[in-house]
Amino acid sequence: MAISSTADLAPSRKARGSESNDRALKLFIELLSVETQQQLFRGEPCIQRFVEIGPRTILSTMAKRSASIQKDQRSSASCYSPEFLSYHDNQPEILYQYQNDQAIYPLSQPTQPQFEPTSPSHLTKRSPSPSKALPMSAIPSAELTLQAGHVILAMTAQKLRRRFDQVPVEKTIRDLSGGKSTLQNELTGDLVAEFGRVPEGVEDQPLSSLAESFQPEFSGIPGKAMSTLISRFISGKMPAGFNQSAIQEYLNSRWGLTKSHATIPLCFAPTMEPARRLANADEARAYLDDLVEKHAAFQGISLVPSNQVADGHESLAPVVMNVADVDEMNKRTKLYRAQFDSLASYLGVDYFASEKAMSESESRIAELEETIRLLNTELDEQFIKGIKPSFNIKQVRKYDSWWNWSREELIRLLNEICQDSSSACPPDMENRLQNLLNKWDANCSEIVRAHLIGLQSRSSAPMNKLQLILEEIFTLGNQTLSIDPLFVHNLPPMGPQTIITDAGCLEYHELPRQISHYPEAMAYGPPWPQGHTSAPFIHIKTREDGQDWMYDSKATSIYHAMLDVGVTTGLTFTHKAVLVTGAGPSSIAASVIQGLLSGGARIIVTTSRSISQSADFYQQMYRQYGAKGSSLSLFPFNQASKQDCEQLVQHIYGPDSPTDGDLDYILPFAAIPQVGEPDAFGGRQELALRAMLVNILRLIGFVRQEKERLRIENRPTMIVLPMSCNEGTFGGDGLYSEAKIGLKALFNRFYSENWSKYLTICGAVIGWTRGTAIMQTSNAVAEEVEKLGVITFTQAEMAFNILALMTPALTALAEDTPIYADLTGGLGSMWNIKQEISAARKRISERQILQIAIAEEDAREQAMICSASTDVESGLPTTRHARLGLQFPPLPDVNEGYPNIEGMIDLTRIPVIVGYSELGPWGNARTRWEIEHRGDFSLEGYIEMAWIMGLIKHVDGHAKGRPYVGWVDADTETPIQDYEVPHKYHKHIMAHAGLRLIKPTKLDSYDPSRKELLHEVAVEEDLAPFETSKSTAEAFKLRHGDCVTLLPIADSDNCRVYIKKGAVLMIPKAVPFDQVVAGRIPEGWDPARYGIPEEIVQQVDVTTLYALCCVSEAFLSAGIKDPYEIYQYIHVSELANCLGSGGGPMKVIQNMYRDRFLDRQIRGDIILEHFVNTMGAWVNMLLLSATGPLKTPVGACATAIESLDIGCEAIQNGRCKVAVVGGCDDYGEELAFEFANIKATANSTEELSKGRTPADISRPTASSRSGFAESAGCGVQILMSAALAIEMGLPIYGVVAYTHMASDQIGRSIPAPGKGILTAARENGQAKESPLLDLNFRRAVFDAEVALINKSHPKQATTLKPDHSETSNAASLRIRDAQNRWANNIRLSDPSISPIRASLATWGLTVDDIKVVSMHGTSTKANEVNEGNVINTQMRHLGRQMGNPLLAVCQKSLTGHPKAGAGAWQLNGCLQMMQENIVPGNRNADNIDKQLREFEHIVYPMESLRVPEIKATLLTSFGFGQKGAINIMVSPRYLFASLSNSDYEDYRSRTTKRQRSATPTFVSRIMKNNLVQVKTRPPWNDPEAMQNFFLDPNSRVVDGQITRAPRTAYKHQDISVPQSAAVSVNEALHAMLATTDHSSPAASASVGVDVEEISSINVDNPIFISRNFTLLERDYCLSAPDPRASFAGRWVAKEAAFKSLQTTSTGAGTAMDQIEILEVGGIPKVVRLTSQLHGHAHEVAFAQGITNIQITISHCNNTAIAVALALRKND
């Protein structure tokens, strides 16, 4: 009773004696073990010493274990731990006998930070320098010898992976090992090996006690185990030459340690091993110095290093030699020289030859240097770099999958039209439709037909309009099937407009010209001087003998006729082959390519930029404009390189030609920007001249050579020369005009040289083209220039002008004579254009300056008129804050249109997904989804990624010395706002996430550029000896026999080992491995950041860490903050753990096999972590504490779906109600190496050489795919029966409609792709007509059967929900049987129906309702073809409607292939697609393999598509070893349709509350770095009741208390949102005040509040119960489901009631039965005092005029809270 008192709280001596006597009596009488221990360790006051008197240490050990368990259950106020002593082992302590022996451990140990292995990079390099002072010896303050305690401490610390000075010696082995029995057993075995024997119960004795036990028999030198550790340390970490003797010698010379003393730090050395072998002696000395300093600090002694360093660098006296010695030395030198000369003469060796060769080499080098200097001087470095060849046939990209892009674009267009049926005209509809018609095929017609069929049942005005549009598209599409694609220029003529705004800003616009018909506008011409013939703006010129080029009206009319065709019927370029150079963004050539692609041409385009930078631009161009039969091949090419020109032409005319070995047109438009007048010409100008003139001529020559070689004489290639009207008129543009003028010479060469039958010439003199890279800055003056009577062009207009020159009519004309096309728009006749442009710029500038001045004057005038004090809205920019969340699924209204399945579904057998998570190359599921469907991150995504990668952390305190709450940079501690995160960390995140180059990390030091292997070598000569321990030396002898000789070292246990000739050694070597790209977890990921304890991180495999993170986050995504909440609804045996793995714990396996073979130091119990099921075991031990089945599927790449299948099966057959499913694998170098050996993975080194980036390595369905890219990670789903999910109010992300596993046929190939999952579609022809597929039929039969059941059981309620009462159990079973037969599994009645069709029919869906297929898509040649074939065959067999293709999603293009986690990530993607109705594209599929074209039921989108609704998804997964898997998910909306409106609204309300509670918890755990909540105890507080709990199927756990209140599958209960006690009290008080019955208008009140932990109420003490609770209260509480919680509630109510009286307490021992709490109207209340309060309580209440006390009781977590309101009646 919490009542304050001033009395002394300590009991008197007499009272203490009485209590001791009472306890002694109880212990004497109650001989049962359990009761005895409870009295000992739970009673008050606590015992201080437990002494066992007997021949052995038995009872004290048992008592200590029991006390540790009892201690965990005591409140935080419990007393300290007692001391356990045995007369056998602790006689001096019992008798209080103390020894004055030398202290083995210091009295106090300094607190040290958490140990990390010493890295050599952290060691200070000590450079000895000569000193003038005399050398001084180091003398330690105390001379120590090796004690048993040192060895025990060193061995224990080494096992625990801690530094020796971080292990508290007062703790036991059991405490230090954290209760891990294997570690205790291993350490005990090592102690036995070291000391020979150990006392019984060694694990429960403090290290200090063990040291005293072992010390009397300790020899003072390391034993076998310790010597092995030292030897292994020296051989594995110290540099060559630093053996044990050398180390001891250094410690003596440097620190003055004797050999015995030096052994102590040597024993401690294995506890602080450096991360890698120390590279040299300096690093070794620095390491040893650090070791000795820590040893001295630990021992509490003083050590001062000597200034003399024992490495030969100490100060030395001058050396003096006499003359005789010098003469003798010279004689010997002459003798050696004579012998050398004689031997060289005898062998015929000219030792001057090397000097001669060196002289010649130096001369040659000098000549080359002079040549290079000359080239750099004449041409300069820029020219030399500019001619470097870049042509690389391996980097060629080819795009020709127009057939797939047509389907994707059509589906996108139809979706946009259907989604906006009111307008039904998306932007740019005409151009998009024209491009689409150019690539139309029969599949497109089927797609439109399918949409039209779907509209027939939706009659309305908008639908009728939509139907007309689709019918028109259908008609136009069918018409184009039999004609060639056409380029139609349907853009109006555009003119420039420059506007100066009121504020003085310059704005450029383009407006349609007055003449809307482009050829008509071009037919006009500029004003010509009198006497000259007027020519159109664009025209053809010819030349007569002796004349200049003149306007040719006849040829011009032909040209303009082609322009007319181009804007009406269109131009076709089908079967034409074109080479285009210089087609960069915003160029004229790029617009030409667009027209050529629209016309069906096959194009070769070159780029001078890197392929990885430019490929996207051309691929997007092809996707938009590529027509039937068109192709686009992209080549790296430098037009300034002669080699490139030659190699390009040779390839075009070679056997692998992309244009069938010839060209129809060449457009050499490549140009190099240049400026400068003649006095400033340099290498760049010469380079430009070479590219724009010289190498164009070379191209002509190379083409002529190839055509002549191949005898192609009847198909001349037209070269469209990019000429210019700028023939020096602009000036200051380098050699640009000279290059263009030089091209004119080809008009004469056509006649004077003999290549005219192979090539023809068309010179296109290009006019002012707005918007190009060159003319972009001159757009503003274009309008002024046009005022001079000329015309300027857009890029599309100039491209159209050029395309008209490439028509058959003009091509035929060019065969007779070169064509001179004047496309200048009249600009070519202006010789003073530069002056005009300058004047135009000046006029615009003057107008702009004037307008700015006017605007400033107006502003000042307005300021004066409106008063300067008038504040104007400044529109301060708002900063957005991130809203982190779990992205719960929406809970929409279930409107009409869903199938009538209410009550038909047995929800206890329907598995649903209520939570999911993943950890992969792109972070978690939310961040991966953003990058997958958006291509970038949202603000929230950036923050989550930055947190995952350790770039930011959250601070709630101070930052930079100021109070601050928010994110800070993890390195600098600088505060950073949410909106700053994307800009600051974008580059880092993108470079260190996803598929990327493999680099050594903190978790894995693997470097593929230096893959280590062992090479066997036979020794050919005796090797120099080395020193090692005796045991190791004997092991060498055992292995090598006579090839090894051992020589013991005096005064040492070590031996010197001599390796003789004939011995076989394994020498490490490093080779580069070509797999250098993988999708590893984002760099910087740290399990400790998720809240996983460091001891767990050090012990388990990384796959277990992944799983722990994912399972924790998956439960949060289900709105479950504590997994133990589930046990309020199910028995612990009904939760299954089905997590699987394909490769298992790779790092542990590597350590166990490789490192053990290499005799490296690894844990002795590592075998426990090597089992595949260990991952699931850790998840259960640390998070779940379930007793359900732990199943571990191993299905290679299909593991996750196999896990899903197992979980669904467990739920469907009723064995479990919840299952944790998924898969996890890590990246391992061994696995990667073997995958590469079978050619399953892409050779990333080769791919990088092809111009691919690491992100492009995985390209599922692409024609260039070459294998998958490996990745790592984990994916998890929380699977649950739908009934339980609805009962708990959990979010439902998707319904698992079907899972299926299949193997395959006879064969010999394990990785061969199989077709076994075709069986999921098995059915005969009659099955399609089965009446069971008619939902109306099944509804009617089901209703009739339920009516009969209700008639047979009149007591059964009319509802379809079974209540599981005894009287209605039979009816419930019959109803569930009917549900199963007519809905859940209709194949029970007709097995001929395919499983896929039946699973969809349950929800009133058909195979046509599947919208998306998430494909396994590994990016291998075989898989995509096989998988597409299997899916297409299934759809065809099931009768899927033509024109309704599945949208394929290939997630591995983004994530790579994680093996076991692949299916889980795919499944998560399916859930996200259904939630947002977005189908992400495969951005790496730049060109779809033509082998996939035959699969008419599949479309492979490259960009994300938004669709109206996704009702169902299909998922396929294939694993090596005949593992085929398929899964169908259904939208949760259909599950909601099976509920009544009232049930759904109730579910929606409770789920919304849960989501609102879970989101803040998730955000808080992110900010506090405790996302993973590791459990330290099972969900029950009383371990003794565990057995009964396991055996009772109705047992449940509520707030740590066991209850027998079973919940039915259909009973809905409100979610109790856990809150803090303070919040609960506040809410309870407000609720009470709101409901208080104020019968009297004049009343006052006083409040009392009390809070108590439920576990602190000892309901097992009958005296306590009888003294404080009345008989009625006892009867009420004992009949409650949880008596302890009920008593706790009554207790705090009594306390609160007493506090509300506001009187002085009579003592803590006062009985509380004077206050009785009864139920009045369902509300706990203190009734009228006259009959219920007694004694002192009644007197106080009566004196204060209290007439009524109202109380409210609530429970929060493991706490009971009560608020009492005492009402007084005022006079």
UniProtKB/Swiss-Prot annotation:
One of its GO terms (molecular function) is fatty-acyl-CoA synthase activity. It comes from the Eukaryota. The keyword Flavoprotein does not apply. Pathway: Secondary metabolite biosynthesis. This is Fatty acid synthase alpha subunit pkiB. One of its GO terms (biological process) is long-chain fatty acid biosynthetic process. Residues 108-133 are annotated as: Disordered. The modification O-(pantetheine 4'-phosphoryl)serine is found at residue 181. Residues 1011-1531 form the Ketosynthase family 3 (KS3) domain. One of its GO terms (cellular component) is fatty acid synthase complex. PROSITE patterns: CARRIER, KS3_1, KS3_2, PHOSPHOPANTETHEINE. Residues 108-130 have a biased composition (Polar residues). The gene is pkiB. Mg(2+) binds at residues 1650-1652, 1754-1755. Pfam families: ACPS, Fas_alpha_ACP, FAS_I_H, ketoacyl-synt, Ketoacyl-synt_C. It catalyses: acetyl-CoA + n malonyl-CoA + 2n NADPH + 4n H(+) = a long-chain-acyl-CoA + n CoA + n CO2 + 2n NADP(+); a fatty acyl-[ACP] + malonyl-[ACP] + H(+) = a 3-oxoacyl-[ACP] + holo-[ACP] + CO2; a (3R)-hydroxyacyl-[ACP] + NADP(+) = a 3-oxoacyl-[ACP] + NADPH + H(+). Belongs to the thiolase-like superfamily. Fungal fatty acid synthetase subunit alpha family. Induction: Induced by oleic acid and stearic acid, but not by linoleic acid. SMART domains: PKS_KS. It comes from Emericella nidulans (strain FGSC A4 / ATCC 38163 / CBS 112.46 / NRRL 194 / M139). The active site is at 1197 (for beta-ketoacyl synthase activity), 1416 (for beta-ketoacyl synthase activity), 1457 (for beta-ketoacyl synthase activity). Residues 575-771 are annotated as: Beta-ketoacyl reductase. Acetyl-CoA binds at residues 1650-1652, 1676, 1686, 1695-1705, 1719-1722, 1753-1755. CDD domains: elong_cond_enzymes, KR_fFAS_SDR_c_like. Residues 143-221 form the Carrier domain. Its EC number is 2.3.1.86, 1.1.1.100, 2.3.1.41. Keywords: Fatty acid biosynthesis, Fatty acid metabolism, Lipid biosynthesis, Lipid metabolism, Magnesium, Metal-binding, Multifunctional enzyme, NAD, NADP, Oxidoreductase, Phosphopantetheine, Phosphoprotein, Transferase.
